[in-house]
Each structure stands twice: as C-alpha cells, then as structure tokens.
Amino acid sequence: LSEPGEYVPVDDQEETSFDVSSINIEENGNRSPINYVLPPGIEQELDNTTTTQRQQNEQSLVLKVCNLKDGDSRAAYKRSDIDMRNYKRIKMFVHAEGKEDNLKNGDFSCFIRLGTDFSSNYYEYEIPLDITDFGSTRAEDIWPQENEIDIPFEIFQDIKQERNSNSENVFLPYVKYV
C-alpha cells in the first residue's frame, strides 16, 4: 500500500476491475492454462459427516485484478473474533498468474493485515510474488515457496518491543523490513 491506514480506492471503475471468487480441486483440476492443484504438503480432509469415506472439496480464494495502477491495491477482508494469541503462526500459500505472459516476478505483491482495525491497530506483512509459467502442472511450480507466507506470531511481539525500546511515537506507523 502506498499509505498506511484504511484504504479507500479512488473512483477508477472504468480502469481497474477486481473480482473475488473461489477455485476448487473438483471443478478446476483441469483448468487451462494452469490447472488447480493442492499446495505442496496439503492433503484433502475427509468428510466425517457421512458414513462413506469422502474427501472434502479443497478450495482457495481467488483475487482477480486487472489494470491495477502502480502503487494501488485491492484486498478481501474477513472480520473474525479469533484470538490469534492462541496460535504460534499463520501460514498461507499464494499463487500468481497473469492473463498473458507479460508479468514478471515482483510485479505484484501479496499482503496480509491482522489487527483490530485498519487505521492504527494492525500488523501488515507483505511479500513480492513470483509468477507461475503457463502450462505448469507441478504443485511446487504453481505454489512456489517464494510466495508462501509463513509468519511466526512472535515476530510481531518482537517488532512491537523494538518500537517501544526505541522510544518511537506509538501514534505513527512503525515499519520494519525483515
């Protein structure tokens, strides 16, 4: 994001399009030009609500954006009452592909925000994305390790303690590149 805080996109409805949907193994396993496969190390869970052993339909969130201006961003939000202090880390597999072969690694980034609001009480973690080549079929190529978000929550505590020990203004965003 170009500025910290809650993001309100400018009115460019004619230029940038943004769609949120889902993709799944059952309906998109033969998708072209890149088929949908499970991320490395992930197995489909069994549906324990039936008497027959059946695998659940594993799926992922799709954020599809076209004509995004440099420095602009789009996001999907989920509000939740989950207390993250009960967990040690958050892990997310990220895949990036272009409509055509005109994207390069690092042209886009993925960010995740965790916090109580989107203006002053949040942590944000961002990584540049590697683009998957058309025709890729291996899970390791479709879900490259460089695109994996794996955040130990203790890093947020460490950064907050660092900010406080440096006597930084707690009312201004504190940025740490790791």
What are these regions (language model features)?
Residues L1-V178:
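Extracellular/surface-associated beta-sandwich interaction domains
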